[in-house]
């Protein structure tokens, strides 16, 4: 079990450290320092404790030379580091006590830390959970990503609209990162490739010339295992110019030219997912991807060579690159380039090594999210990489033709380069030795639908790894009241073995345990109500049902279905003032991509509906609607702990897995959802009676998509109550100043638009089923004991959904890693 730091943690030493950090960082005594300065001083003191373990970990890896996974991801949504590090050091209470003695409040200090703006949604949070589990399970790993200056954006809600402002999370510095200038690498863009024959070897040689380049400089952030000595590194790359400043140009008055290289570097790391509605944005995204991938692969190869006498031929025995979605797929061609152009390997040998080294996780069923690049852009920006991809494609197309003679349809679907585009998912599948989906249903859909041709040709590559979450952050840190109660009941083994929660099943019928559990939920609701009052100025009743949907805003996630139902419910109450219902607080939180128009309109709709409902005294507070601004990991932790109902209402077959569903479940909420993604497995664990399922099945959705037969207009014409709700989108009820404000939403539900079907995501089709499920939730909540038993069962059955289980499966079945305990 976890080794507490208590034995070698000196409270006095720690206090001294904090005081001296304040002096050396700010020339201030602790009493004079402001909250942000105190946060920095405390963080440096905690980092001091981490450093020895961090050094020991890397010494251990040098000594044992274990196989290492490089987890490559565009996003790492880490959340705040201070509290998480204190928990994984098993020193939270000791440090809190030391700070108390200095007259400092740990909660105030933790609140000073901005969330690291390195990700946006589930993809990035999964990567963060995986890093936590890898270190806790003592597996050697690097996370590889980009050190974004502003991340995605900070969301502000102004007059109901989402406004994107830069998220300047680094403005006060990140106390936990360490710059590693000694591992800098050049990354080249553009130019052309000159080839010549080497007379000595008779080989064709390729040299990129006339290119522009930037220098990638890594910053390492410690990722601590819980209760052990392992500290792995999240390595995020910053871009610096090759030549900082051109004095010559400056002196000649060409100020633009003087800082040109600086700007090239700066742009690459400015933001996550620059808007790719335009050519420049597309180019910048591809630059970002190649930038961090090239630097990471160069470093991994160099590290391997330094430990293996300069030889690269067995690198696959010690290195594996896991591609988290399609963004890092250029790693395939970059590894080929390094093996051939820099290490003199022939094609066949390089390809053999590459295909034993790279593995791919597919995260989406949505075709538009499988990246494709115009040949013109790809070949101009990455000329040598494009040549290599072209050759991979040529050889693979020959394989297809040999296996399926005369079948041009197979070529069309499977070729890496086709129709003027480079298809990154196809490259990842062809080169990867493993292709995994992230929930059982998702993997089955990939095999039978989206990637069927690949599955038929290379079935041995495909496997499923259902996602998970780290209980250290999402229960132990996010919900200390519940965490302590669980430990009191079953011991603290669950912190590193979540399957132990099953022991709580002994208590689900115990009236006293039920009362305690619901009292904890109530206190967490009071905490969230306070947050809402402070941030939204809205009073919400902790005795109401907290019905929550927090996640990225996308049409398939159907925040629209949720708010249309709220409008419907409001109509019911207005028609019948004595309408009998348990008061309900509908809580939303979501960022919409800056260029995603209808998603942003949905946010405006939610806020306008909230404005009308929250200010209507006649409904006596039966409904409140809250949109939480700038949803992120840190406020997510407060939200998950307080939810009664977890809205997981994506159109069946569209959500690969989802992980928010697991966070709510772990904290004792009931899933109101479709049979989609990991919801299917949640229902398998808790039993259908402990969830509230509605809507079309995945098979039904796919059938409608393939064969047609659904007309939303029919529902509109025949269902008066649904028609009333839709008419309110265009009659000014929620936008008196502009009746056309929500016309696009109305049209998307009822009118075909070019190639797009009306109601693409079956909102009206599922509406009645959803409304009925919501009515049942109301009914169930009134049965106090039945409800308590259901939500306690959800917590007790959450064991499967730990990222520790997921990582154990990746490590043993895909990566073939060996646990490497760190001795100190």
Give a label for each model feature.
Residues 1-824:
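A conserved ligand/cofactor-binding region detector
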């Amino acid at each position: 079990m976890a080794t507490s730091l208590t034995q070698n943690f000196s409270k006095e030493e720690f206090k001294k450290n904090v005081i001296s950090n304040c002096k050396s960082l700010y020339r201030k005594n602790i009493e004079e320092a402001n909250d942000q300065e105190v946060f920095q001083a405390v963080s440096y003191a905690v980092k001091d404790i981490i450093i020895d373990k961090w050094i020991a970990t890397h010494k251990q890896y040098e000594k044992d030379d274990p196989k290492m996974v490089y987890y490559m991801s565009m996003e790492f949504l880490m959340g705040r580091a201070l509290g998480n590090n204190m928990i994984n050091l098993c020193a939270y209470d000791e440090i809190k006590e030391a700070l108390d003695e200095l007259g400092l409040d740990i909660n105030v200090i933790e609140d000073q830390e901005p969330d690291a703006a390195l990700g946006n949604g589930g993809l990035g949070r999964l990567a963060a959970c995986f890093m936590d589990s890898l270190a806790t399970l003592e597996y050697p790993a690097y996370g590889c990503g980009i050190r974004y200056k502003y991340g995605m954006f900070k969301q502000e809600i102004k007059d109901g609209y989402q406004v994107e402002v830069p998220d300047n999370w680094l403005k006060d510095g990140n106390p936990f990162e360490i710059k590693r200038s000694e591992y800098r690498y050049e990354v080249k863009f553009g130019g052309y490739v000159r080839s010549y024959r080497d007379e000595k070897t008779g080989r064709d040689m390729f040299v990129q010339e006339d290119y522009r380049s930037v220098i990638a400089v890594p910053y390492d952030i410690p990722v601590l295992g819980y209760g052990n000595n392992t500290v792995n590194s999240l390595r995020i790359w910053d871009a610096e110019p090759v030549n900082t400043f051109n004095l010559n140009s400056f002196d000649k008055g060409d100020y633009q030219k003087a800082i040109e290289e600086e700007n090239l570097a700066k742009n690459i790391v400015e933001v996550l997912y620059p808007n790719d509605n335009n050519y420049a944005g597309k180019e910048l995204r591809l630059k970002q991807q190649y930038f961090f991938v090239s630097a990471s692969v160069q470093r991994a190869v160099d590290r391997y060579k330094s430990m293996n006498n300069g030889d690269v031929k067995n690198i696959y025995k010690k290195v594996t690159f896991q591609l988290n979605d399609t963004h890092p797929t250029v790693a395939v061609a970059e590894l080929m380039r390094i093996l051939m152009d820099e290490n003199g390997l022939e094609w066949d040998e390089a390809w053999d090594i590459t295909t034993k080294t790279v593995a791919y996780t597919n995260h989406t069923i949505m075709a538009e999210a499988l990246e494709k690049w115009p040949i013109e852009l790809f070949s101009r920006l990455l000329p040598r990489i494009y040549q290599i991809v072209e050759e991979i494609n040529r050889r693979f197309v020959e394989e297809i033709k040999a296996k399926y003679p005369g079948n041009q349809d197979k070529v069309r679907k499977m070729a890496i380069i086709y129709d003027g585009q480079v298809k990154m998912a196809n490259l990842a599948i062809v080169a990867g030795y493993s292709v995994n989906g992230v929930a059982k249903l998702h993997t089955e859909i990939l095999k039978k639908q989206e990637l069927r041709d690949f599955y038929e040709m290379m079935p041995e590559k495909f496997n499923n790894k259902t996602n998970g979450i780290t209980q250290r952050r999402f229960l132990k840190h996010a919900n200390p009241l519940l965490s302590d109660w669980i430990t009191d009941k079953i011991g603290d083994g669950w912190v590193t073995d979540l399957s132990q929660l099953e022991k709580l099943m002994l208590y689900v019928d115990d009236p006293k345990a039920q009362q305690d559990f619901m009292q904890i939920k109530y206190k967490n609701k009071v905490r969230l109500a306070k947050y809402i009052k402070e941030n939204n100025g809205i009073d919400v009743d902790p005795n109401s049902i907290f019905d929550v949907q927090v996640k990225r805003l996308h049409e398939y996630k159907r925040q629209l279905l949720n708010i249309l139902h709220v409008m419907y419910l409001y109509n019911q109450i207005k028609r019948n003032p004595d309408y009998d219902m348990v008061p309900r607080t509908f809580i939303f939180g979501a960022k919409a991509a800056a260029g995603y128009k209808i998603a942003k309109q949905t946010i405006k709709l939610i806020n306008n509906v909230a404005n009308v409902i929250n200010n209507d005294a006649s409904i006596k507070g039966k409904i409140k609607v809250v949109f939480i601004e700038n949803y992120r990991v840190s406020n997510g932790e407060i939200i998950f702990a307080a939810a009664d109902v977890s809205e997981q209402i994506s159109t069946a077959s569209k959500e690969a897995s989802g992980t928010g569903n697991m966070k709510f479940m772990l904290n004792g909420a009931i899933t109101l959802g479709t049979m989609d993604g990991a919801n299917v497995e949640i229902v398998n664990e808790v039993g259908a009676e402990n969830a509230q399922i509605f809507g079309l099945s995945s098979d039904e959705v796919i059938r409608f998509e393939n064969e047609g037969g659904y007309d939303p207009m029919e529902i509109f014409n025949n269902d008066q109550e649904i028609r009333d709700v839709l008419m309110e989108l265009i009659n000014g009820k929620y936008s008196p100043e502009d009746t056309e404000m929500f016309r696009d939403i109305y049209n998307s539900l009822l009118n075909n638009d070019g190639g797009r079907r009306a109601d693409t995501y079956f909102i009206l089709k599922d509406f009645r089923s959803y409304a009925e499920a919501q009515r049942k939730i109301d009914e169930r909540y009134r049965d106090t004991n039945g409800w308590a038993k259901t939500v306690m069962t959800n917590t007790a059955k959450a064991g499967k959904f730990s990222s520790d289980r997921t990582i154990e499966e990746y490590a043993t079945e895909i990566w073939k890693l060996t646990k490497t305990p760190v001795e100190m």
